[in-house]
Amino acid sequence: MLSPSENTALLVMDVQPAALDRISDKDAYLTRVRATVEAARRKAVPIRFVVVGFRPGMPEVSPRNQVFGAYRKQASTMLVDPRPAITPEDGDVVVTKRRVSAFTGSDLEVVLRGGDVQHLVLCGIATSGVVLSTVREAADKDYRLTVLSDLCADPDPEVHRVLLEKVFVRQAAVIASEQWVQSLG
């Protein structure tokens, strides 16, 4: 059996200014995410920031896309600057995606396979968006999965609860970030 940090990567997904504006108590959320990222770095767990981003004018987005199409209509610059809210450090990798799942429209899988990653530890905004889509796709790709319950956030508290308590547990270990950090030793 793998140790908690062996062949593991921490995916910090869509923790960007535009996404943070959609959740309550974003300062406390960011504090928890930063603490977990720092603990992972101390234990040499690779950090992979996944951000959503597009070229100016958003040519990657079809007018039929219900998630991102509204931003395109508004000629939004919000998603054209895909900086994570937590500053990456040397050794961290920032992956830009162009759809909801962290895998779709990105080179995430190439980056993970290049590092022989077999276990993904997931957190991000929104639970009903990037976290749900990534859990499903990663499970189909046979990754071992852990979802950090207190580092997932969603504008809809009931959807968040149902996903964590009833949906994700079918394909992932769902634990608090503190428990995962303690498991690193």
PLM regions: where:
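A cross-domain feature marking catalytic cores of carbohydrate-active enzymes
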Residues: 15, 49-52, 149
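Aromatic- and acidic-residue-enriched segments that line the glycan-binding/catalytic groove
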Residues: 59-71
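Von Willebrand factor
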Residues: 40-59
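Short acidic, Gly/Ser-rich segments with clustered Asp/Glu that frequently serve as metal-coordination loops
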Residues: 17-21
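Active-site-adjacent betaalpha module
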Residues: 1-7, 35-43, 68-185
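Acidic-leg catalytic submotif of subtilisin-like serine proteases
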Residues: 9-16
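Short amphipathic alpha-helical segment that frequently serves as the phosphate-/nucleotide-binding helix
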Residues: 26-34
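Short, solvent-exposed loop/turn segments at secondary-structure boundaries
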Residues: 22-26, 159
